[in-house]
């Protein structure tokens, strides 16, 4: 990892927790040692963004798990970047595979959301990744490059973007990409950024890995030169999240 890329660990709590259990988790995180050279962001369910921001130590940032592409309006069930910021959160996760595959969000919609969230001043954790049949068909590169292009077309300032590579076949399945598999895709993604955006953006943009990251797998993954951190699902609800935060130590 280049010295200019600050290690980034995101915890995606998905649709989990209640005030009591999340309060206990937050207590554990607040007591944990967070290395100065590591950025930590937690993404609680929408209903608990305010709660999490009030309870979490300021050293840990808060993200929303999704947002819509406009400021206000007749969009029942949606939230806007302005609302997210109003609750004290500074990041949003966009394009997560569950949004793409469970809720049918298209590349185009995700691109529009990325553009609006950035314009409104949020940091964006933009997710990309191939499904198992796509990996087995040998089209991993094609899929992730297409997804990345739609995101890149909507980004003016890359300093507010973290790219999260999440092989869909490794999310919540207990299967993890090997450190070598993760490094290979991350390296290719950095090459794509160099060719299609700029060398400076390729060098400075953090590319993080998501997909069944645990306390046991994080250290070897973190040692790969192009793995700049993690987006953690299930393990972010457990005390081992602290081990993942300290994966570079």
From Swiss-Prot:
PROSITE patterns associated with the record: TIM_1, TIM_2
Catalytic activity field: D-glyceraldehyde 3-phosphate = dihydroxyacetone phosphate; dihydroxyacetone phosphate = methylglyoxal + phosphate
Residues forming the catalytic site: 96 (electrophile), 166 (proton acceptor)
Annotated positions of the N6-succinyllysine modification: 149, 156, 194
SUPFAM superfamilies from the UniProt entry: Triosephosphate isomerase (TIM)
GO MF, any single term: methylglyoxal synthase activity
Location(s), subcellular: Cytoplasm
Its biological purpose: Triosephosphate isomerase is an extremely efficient metabolic enzyme that catalyzes the interconversion between dihydroxyacetone phosphate (DHAP) and D-glyceraldehyde-3-phosphate (G3P) in glycolysis and gluconeogenesis. It is also responsible for the non-negligible production of methylglyoxal a reactive cytotoxic side-product that modifies and can alter proteins, DNA and lipids.
Protein name (record): Triosephosphate isomerase
Annotated organism of origin: Homo sapiens (Human)
Gene: TPI1
């Amino acid at each position: 990892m280049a010295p200019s890329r600050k290690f980034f660990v995101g915890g995606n709590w998905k649709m989990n927790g209640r005030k009591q259990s999340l309060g206990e988790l937050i207590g554990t995180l607040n007591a944990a040692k967070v290395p100065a050279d590591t950025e930590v962001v937690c993404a609680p369910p929408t209903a608990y963004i305010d709660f999490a921001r009030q309870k979490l130590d300021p050293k840990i940032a808060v993200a929303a798990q999704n947002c819509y592409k406009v400021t206000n309006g007749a969009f029942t069930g949606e939230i806007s970047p302005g609302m997210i910021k109003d609750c004290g959160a500074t990041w949003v996760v966009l394009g997560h595979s569950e949004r793409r595959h469970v809720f049918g969000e298209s590349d185009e919609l995700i691109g529009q959301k990325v553009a609006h969230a950035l314009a409104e001043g949020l940091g964006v954790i933009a997710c990309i990744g191939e499904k198992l049949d796509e990996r087995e068909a040998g089209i991993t590169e094609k899929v992730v490059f297409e997804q990345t292009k739609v995101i890149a077309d909507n980004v003016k300032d890359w300093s507010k973007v973290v790219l999260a590579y999440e092989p869909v076949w490794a999310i919540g399945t207990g299967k993890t990409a090997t450190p070598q598999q993760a490094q290979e895709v991350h390296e290719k993604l950095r090459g794509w950024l160099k060719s299609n955006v700029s060398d400076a953006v390729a060098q400075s943009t953090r590319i993080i890995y998501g997909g069944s990251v645990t306390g046991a797998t994080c250290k070897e993954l973190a040692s790969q030169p192009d793995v700049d951190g993690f987006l953690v699902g299930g393990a972010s609800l457990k005390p081992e999240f602290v081990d993942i935060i300290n994966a570079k130590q």
